């Protein structure tokens, strides 16, 4: 049905519309009135303000209810009733409780305890199984982990292989990491992944032998370099693997989502899981580096495997904090990941996976338990057809309508929507960026939907006032259809951009998350075609006015039923328009508005809301990480609200006065709440990052350094008892991108090595200093002693070294020229890495708590150097909050290990959580000249 200026006669009295020429009597008399059922249908589906208001309210309820249901863990996941699965879940839950008893980072004794626990559990599960085998991966690797950064890692991954009946099939890898960060119990990251692996292992151990070999990698030290996965790449078992499923946690509970997949050929099999939950919107975010954290998926993909990344993704404000504990998760979260892992692994391990789609990115999503996926080539084809087809169909129809049906479209009618969009976007940008963002910048962390709802209300009011104003001054025959056509054109342009991007899709410029625009364009364009077809097959306005016909349509549009609460306004609008135009239009457009509304608004609203909510819910907490993230989130809030409004814009003229009043009240209330609500609370805390540093070049004094967003946490530090008692000043320094580092000299020295003075935490012995070799190279050799330590980093700040050596036992190393580029190992077992472009950082990770680091390096002095020495900054990290955990003679009170950290955790407000800044909670550094 055309816009309100077209006017369905259900809102106009009989004598206004159908007076006969002579006697002025009504066309219908009381004896010709339709029955109650027909009246009700006309009242509901007639183009009246009350009818539209009902539709809008139902649409909002439908959109929010379905989206909440689809994303709700408790409503969509059923706990198992099968006996075996129930036992597996109970066992995995107990495993999770044991794994997450203490923080268990790579640099902690609790990490060893978790390793030993897993080893014991694996042996219990696979014992007496003839086709399974266990291997404790002891690989040592030395490799370039980033540009000019070389990493050494000693692995203690736990590997299990379930040999398949068909050795010709490439194996399936299931992987998760068992280390946590120092500040977290690691329940979600990645305890649930490990517990799920144990559950899947038990499933296979108690069922028939699979066709395909399945390998489990319970890997270590993922958090600070993906080291466990990288070490496994060098293991002999890795060569037989073709596919993988990586289990991860970058949030803290909720539903496990399919983050990304290597290709369509493997992603499509996610439809075999019982509770699919997925969207390639997150894949696009990862591939375009909007999400900065990485998972082991990266290592496996770069090694040539095909697979999936299944992970928990929210909330990120308790991710890597002590709040990632067993109290804050749901048994159903574990079952969601575990059951989907069982289903996927069971299917892939017993089916032959072909190469179809292995070279194509996948576009995918899920809704209400159904999984949909497509190769991008198919989506490009569909989009291309739509881009070409709809102009071909709509162009002639529009020409016929304007040329022969006398549909007059004035300049003001044509420009009203573009001008309204420009005006609304401009006002909203000012309100949001200069108002909300300045008044309460971190509110998206706790109330993102309040910002979206308020912004949407303000935008709708602006559209309502502007578009109705233009329509009053310059009425159109069918402004609704004009608006639908113009929105279709907007989507058409967006679809061209999306299709071009998909046709050249690549990492760094990924468009796989933009698939919703295909559906949005199809719905809007189809509705525009219906409207144009209605005009095309109607009589022209001129014909209608000349034939003298007073006959109403069989639909009975001349009747008027329903409440009068809005009809007076509509009658006034009728009096404002030409009578013949109104009469003609109402005859030919009785109830098509409802068809157009139902075609466009409910589905479009649901797609936009659900997609927008998933994105916001996934990244809103990252507002605490940088100013760039803050700007991105506020931009997304505005885009979310503007796109959510688009489907309703063709009908905005008909909004009921009560809904307009409600929007006004809501907008005012929203602005007030945004101004006064606290951005952080116990459920949505502020996350701060901690490290305690000792620089032995200056003194044995320790300094607490805390990192967070600028200007919001210095008062918390100043309120610490030790700070107030010693009258210590908290000093803050602005960092880039809206961050701030605050520090203070701590009276609470670290005690991670009981009985040791801080000066004994790091000692460096220079074994060989500036020994001149051939080709003008200099070489040096040092031994680093760091008790109870697993992690150190060497920084070559002034000169890059050309080669590094991790000595095994012998000092004998081949001549520099004979050493191959990259990694090598000499006959004495020494690990060597050579890079003539230069190495400026060497990262060391070892398993033996008290073994020294024995390091050698070669460098080339600068021509203008007066002294041929190399400056080396040695920094070692300790991460153990409870060194006594795991046994040994070093048991101590956990509260005494890092008392400065414990003080902050204990005395901070309940709306603050704490995470580690570096790989440890304590670092001790020493600078030497070699």
Curated annotation (Swiss-Prot):
It is found in: Vacuole membrane. Binds 2 Zn(2+) ions per subunit. InterPro entries: Fxna-like_M28_dom (IPR048024), M28_fam (IPR045175), Peptidase_M28 (IPR007484), PFF1_C (IPR053975), PFF1_TM (IPR053976). Residues 1-28, 542-570 are annotated as: Disordered. Gene3D superfamilies: Zn peptidases. It holds the Pfam family PFF1_TM. One of its GO terms (cellular component) is vacuolar membrane. GO terms for biological process: proteolysis. Residues 71-379, 433-449, 502-514, 620-631, 679-930 are vacuolar. The chain crosses the membrane at residues 50-70, 380-400, 412-432, 450-470, 481-501, 515-535, 599-619, 632-652, 658-678. Glycans are attached at residues 163, 354, 620, 697, 768, 808, 890. Its main location: membrane. Belongs to the peptidase M28 family. May be involved in vacuolar sorting and osmoregulation. This is Vacuolar membrane protease. It comes from Candida dubliniensis (strain CD36 / ATCC MYA-646 / CBS 7987 / NCPF 3949 / NRRL Y-17841).
């Amino acid at each position: 049905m055309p816009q309100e200026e077209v006017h369905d006669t259900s809102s106009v009295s009989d004598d206004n519309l159908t007076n006969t020429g002579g006697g002025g009597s009504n066309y219908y008399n009381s004896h010709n009135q339709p029955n109650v059922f027909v009246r009700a249908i006309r009242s509901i589906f007639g183009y009246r303000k009350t009818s539209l208001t009902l539709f809008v309210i139902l649409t909002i309820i439908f959109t929010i209810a379905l989206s909440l249901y689809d994303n709700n863990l408790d409503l969509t996941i059923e706990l198992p009733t099968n006996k075996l699965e129930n036992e597996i879940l109970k066992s995995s839950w107990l495993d999770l409780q044991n794994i997450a008893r203490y923080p268990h980072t790579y640099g902690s004794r609790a990490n060893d305890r978790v390793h030993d626990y897993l080893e014991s559990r694996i042996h219990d599960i696979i014992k007496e199984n003839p086709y399974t085998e266990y291997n404790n991966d002891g690989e040592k690797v030395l490799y370039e982990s980033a540009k000019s950064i070389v990493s050494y890692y000693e692995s203690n991954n736990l590997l299990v292989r379930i040999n398949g009946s068909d050795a010709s099939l490439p194996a399936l890898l299931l992987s998760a990491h068992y280390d946590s960060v120092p500040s977290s119990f690691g329940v979600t990251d990645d305890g649930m992944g490990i517990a799920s692996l144990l559950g899947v292992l038990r499933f296979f151990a108690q069922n028939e032998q699979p066709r395909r070999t399945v390998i489990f990698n319970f890997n270590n030290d993922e958090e600070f370099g993906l080291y466990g996965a990288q070490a496994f790449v060098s293991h002999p078992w890795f060569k037989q693997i073709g596919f993988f499923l990586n289990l991860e946690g970058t949030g803290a509970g909720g539903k496990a989502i399919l983050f990304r997949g290597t290709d369509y050929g493997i992603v499509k099999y996610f439809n075999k899981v019982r509770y699919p939950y997925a969207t390639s919107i997150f894949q696009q975010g990862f591939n375009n580096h909007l999400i900065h954290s990485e998972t082991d998926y990266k290592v496996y993909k770069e090694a040539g495997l095909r697979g999936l990344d299944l992970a928990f993704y929210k909330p990120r404000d308790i991710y890597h904090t002590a709040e990632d504990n067993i109290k804050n998760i749901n048994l159903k979260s574990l079952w969601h990941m575990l059951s989907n892992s069982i289903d996927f692994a069971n299917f892939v391990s017993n089916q032959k996976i072909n190469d179809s789609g292995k070279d194509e990115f996948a576009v995918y999503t899920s809704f209400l338990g159904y999984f949909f996926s497509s190769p991008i080539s198919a989506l490009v084809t569909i989009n291309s057809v739509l881009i070409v087809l709809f102009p071909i169909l709509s162009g002639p129809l529009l020409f016929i309508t304007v040329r022969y049906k006398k549909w007059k479209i004035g300049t003001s009618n044509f420009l009203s929507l573009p001008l309204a969009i420009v005006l609304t976007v401009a006002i909203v940008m000012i309100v949001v960026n200069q108002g909300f963002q300045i008044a309460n910048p971190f509110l998206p962390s706790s109330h993102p939907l309040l910002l979206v709802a308020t912004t949407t209300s303000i935008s709708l009011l602006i559209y309502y006032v502007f578009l109705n104003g233009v329509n009053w001054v310059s009425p159109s025959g069918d402004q609704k259809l004009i608006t639908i056509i113009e929105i279709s054109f907007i989507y058409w342009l967006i679809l061209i951009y999306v299709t071009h991007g998909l046709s050249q899709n690549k990492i760094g410029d990924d468009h796989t998350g933009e698939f919703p625009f295909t559906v949005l364009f199809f719905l809007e364009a189809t509705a525009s075609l219906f409207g144009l077809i209605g005009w095309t097959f109607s009589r022209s306005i001129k014909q209608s006015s000349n034939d003298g016909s007073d006959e109403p349509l069989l639909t009975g549009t001349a009747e008027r039923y329903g409440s009068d609460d809005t009809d007076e306004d509509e009658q006034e609008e009728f009096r404002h328009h030409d009578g013949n135009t109104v009469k003609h239009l109402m005859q030919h457009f009785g109830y098509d508005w409802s068809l157009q509304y139902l075609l466009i608004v409910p589905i479009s609203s649901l797609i936009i809301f659900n997609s927008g909510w998933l994105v916001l819910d996934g990244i809103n907490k990252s507002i605490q990480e940088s100013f760039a993230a803050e700007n991105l989130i506020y931009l997304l809030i505005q885009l979310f609200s503007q796109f959510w409004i688009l489907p309703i814009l063709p009908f905005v003229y008909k909004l009921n006065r009560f809904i307009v009043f409600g929007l006004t009240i809501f907008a005012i209330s929203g602005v007030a709440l945004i101004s006064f609500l606290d951005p952080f609370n116990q459920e949505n805390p502020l996350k701060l990052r901690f490290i305690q540093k000792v620089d032995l070049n200056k003194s044995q004094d320790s300094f607490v350094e805390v990192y967070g967003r600028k200007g919001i946490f210095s008062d918390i530090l100043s309120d610490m008892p030790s700070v107030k008692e010693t009258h210590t000043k908290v000093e803050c320094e602005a960092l880039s991108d809206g961050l701030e580092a605050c520090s203070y000299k701590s009276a609470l020295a670290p005690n991670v090595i009981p009985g040791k003075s801080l000066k004994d935490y790091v000692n460096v012995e220079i074994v060989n200093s500036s020994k001149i070799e051939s080709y003008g190279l200099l070489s040096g050799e040092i031994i680093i002693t760091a008790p109870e330590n697993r992690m150190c980093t060497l920084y070559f700040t002034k000169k890059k070294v050309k080669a590094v050596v991790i000595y095994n036992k012998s000092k004998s190393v081949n001549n520099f020229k004979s050493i191959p580029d990259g990694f090598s190992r000499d006959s004495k077992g020494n690990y060597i890495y050579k890079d003539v472009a230069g190495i400026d950082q060497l990262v060391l990770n070892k398993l033996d708590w008290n073994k020294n680091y024995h390091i050698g390096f070669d460098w080339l002095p600068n021509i203008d150097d007066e002294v041929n020495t190399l400056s080396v900054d040695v920094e070692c990290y300790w991460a153990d909050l409870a060194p006594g955990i795991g046994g040994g003679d070093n048991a101590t009170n956990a509260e005494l290990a890092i008392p400065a950290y414990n003080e902050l955790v204990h005395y901070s407000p309940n709306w603050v959580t704490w995470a580690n800044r570096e790989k440890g909670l304590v670092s001790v550094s020493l600078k030497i000249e070699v």
